[in-house]
Every structure is written in C-alpha cells, then in structure tokens.
C-alpha cells in the first residue's frame, strides 16, 4: 500500500521551528571557506529573525522580517535598519559561498510547497525522506526559481536542499553532514556543506563552504 503523504507546509513548519525555537536566545556558529572563518549568530525576536556575522572584528547585522504577505531582508547600518535591495540577496557573505538569502533560509517560508514523489532520490545518508518542492513566489528575486528540500520521514530533520536556477539547473546544494537533537526534541543541523555548481556544467562543483552550528546552551 502506498503511504499517505503529509502536508508539505506542515513539514516545512517543523523544520522552521528547529531554527527558531530558542526564542530570544542566540544560536551561534561559523561559516568556513578554506582558511576563512566567519562567526555568526541567529535569534528569533518577535516578527523577525536577527542574524549577525563578524568580519574584521566588526559585527554586522541583517534581519529576516515577516510581513502579512511574504518576507523581506533588512540590513543594519549605523544603528538603523533599511530594506536590503533584492539584488543583494544573492551577494556572498564575507567572501564565502553563503549568501544573505542562503543564511536566512527564506525559501522555507515560501507558499505553495508540495511533496514530489521520486523514490529513486528519496534517500539521503541512508535516511528515508519526503522531498518538498517549493516555487519562488517572485522568481525574479534571488538565486533560485525553486528549491527542493529533503525532510526525514521519521524525525523531521532537514538533510538536503537543492537550489535550482531559472534554467532548471542545480545552482547550489546544501548537504547536512550531521544533526543535533535540541531540548524540545526537535532536530537541527550541526554541520552543513554548501556545494556551488558550475553554471555551464551543474554536475561539477566549483566551490565549497561549510556552516557549523554550536550546540544550544
């Protein structure tokens, strides 16, 4: 008998809760590319998630703000927040392969997610996963026309994200190397590999970064 698919939106909600459940507490980590290490933190503050990263001993802040319809990214300068131009969503942070859009994971909040059946590709790291496909509601904004997210059928952890460009080609792959269990029983990634593909040959990796998360205190 074929198993019944859960609601794709509910699956994404569980993944999002893993990132934001530590309300008003910072989740800390670092972005690595070769010898470059960029410390960062993220925390839920009311209707936004605040991100901070350290470059040349200076902390920089940007926020993912939730509105009635959709989200926007705010950038802080001289103590004031302004809307980050959408052209900068795809700008790498501090020379890494991780962009503002990537770190904010704004795609997890896009509407119209659906589960796609691809039994041949549904296993990641030996884990049986639901594959959730999410179209970009504004395909002219950011790097991805749509993304695919692999979510563990048993524990709800996210194992892989594929960012697909406007040509339908794989632009970037986020692979979860390891996960950690949080105090509320949910799962969140401990290490994520960011794999940038060659636009002329999407099977070829041209650059790699890592995102390492500290265990919440």
Please annotate each region the language model reported.
Residues 28-30, 38, 49-53, 59-62, ...:
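Intrinsically disordered, low-complexity segments enriched in polar/charged residues with Gly/Pro
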Residues 125-217:
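Gly/Pro-enriched, hydrophobic low-complexity segments
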Residues 3-78:
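N-terminal mature ectodomain segment of secretory-pathway/periplasmic proteins
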Residues 3-14, 20-21, 66-145, 166-168:
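Flexible, processing/modification-adjacent segments and terminal tails
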Residues 29, 35, 47, 57, ...:
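Intrinsic-disorder/low-complexity loop/linker signature
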Residues 35-40, 56-64, 78-85, 139-144, ...:
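Short, surface-exposed beta-strand/loop "edge" segments at domain boundaries and coil↔beta transitions
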Residues 39-45, 63-66, 113-122, 177-180:
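Short, exposed beta-strand/loop patches in secreted or surface proteins that constitute
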Residues 46-52, 69-74, 91-101, 181-187, ...:
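Short, surface-exposed linear segments at secondary-structure transitions and domain or protein termini
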């Amino acid at each position: 008998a074929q198993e019944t698919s859960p609601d794709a939106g509910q699956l994404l909600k569980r993944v999002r809760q893993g990132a934001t459940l530590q309300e008003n507490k910072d989740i800390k980590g670092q972005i690595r590319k070769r010898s470059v290490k960029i410390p960062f933190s993220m925390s839920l503050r009311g209707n936004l998630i605040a991100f901070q990263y350290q470059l040349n001993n200076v902390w920089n802040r940007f926020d993912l703000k939730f509105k009635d319809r959709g989200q926007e990214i705010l950038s802080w300068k001289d103590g004031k927040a302004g809307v980050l131009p959408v052209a900068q969503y795809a700008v790498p942070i501090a020379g890494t392969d991780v962009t503002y859009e990537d770190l904010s994971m704004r795609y997890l909040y896009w509407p119209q997610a659906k589960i796609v059946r691809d039994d041949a590709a549904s296993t990641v790291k030996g884990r049986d996963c639901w594959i959730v496909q999410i179209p970009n509601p504004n395909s002219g904004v950011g790097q991805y026309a749509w993304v695919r997210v692999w979510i563990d059928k048993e524990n709800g952890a996210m194992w892989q994200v594929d960012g697909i460009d406007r040509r339908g080609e794989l632009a970037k792959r986020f692979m979860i190397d390891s996960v950690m269990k949080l105090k509320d029983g949910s799962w969140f990634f401990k290490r994520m590999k960011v794999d940038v593909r060659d636009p002329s040959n999407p099977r070829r990796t041209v650059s790699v970064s890592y995102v390492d998360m500290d265990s919440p205190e």
